[in-house]
């Protein structure tokens, strides 16, 4: 009924899949128009794989970290067009993508163009290397200092 209320045939826009192996999951992503992120418990690896397949992701960030993963990924990519402020906006964005093939194509193109901002970001690695170097340096400077396990 929710799909019908927005003029969308549910059998075209909603698919509940059985458990899939990884290849089947990627194939489903490649055959999909967009990923609707789950509310309150955002997708992590699911979102990463969807973005890797060029799928636009519609999300509504929650109050807690568990509901903000997709938002953080999209923000890192510079793509906040599909980030909803509330549940009503989440539905509006999803319906807009379903009714406007041109917008959907534009969003897919933007995801594909920007995904390396997410996948090739080396800042975390650089910060981790700096942390390790600082810890080694601190240990060399004070080798007998008591440390917490």
Where are the regions that the model predicts?
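A donor-sugar binding/catalytic signature common to diverse glycosyltransferases
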Residues: 22, 27-69
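Short helix-capping segments at alpha-helix termini
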Residues: 4-11
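Short beta->alpha linker loops
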Residues: 20, 42, 85-88, 123
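C-terminal amphipathic helix plus adjacent low-complexity
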Residues: 11-18, 92-149
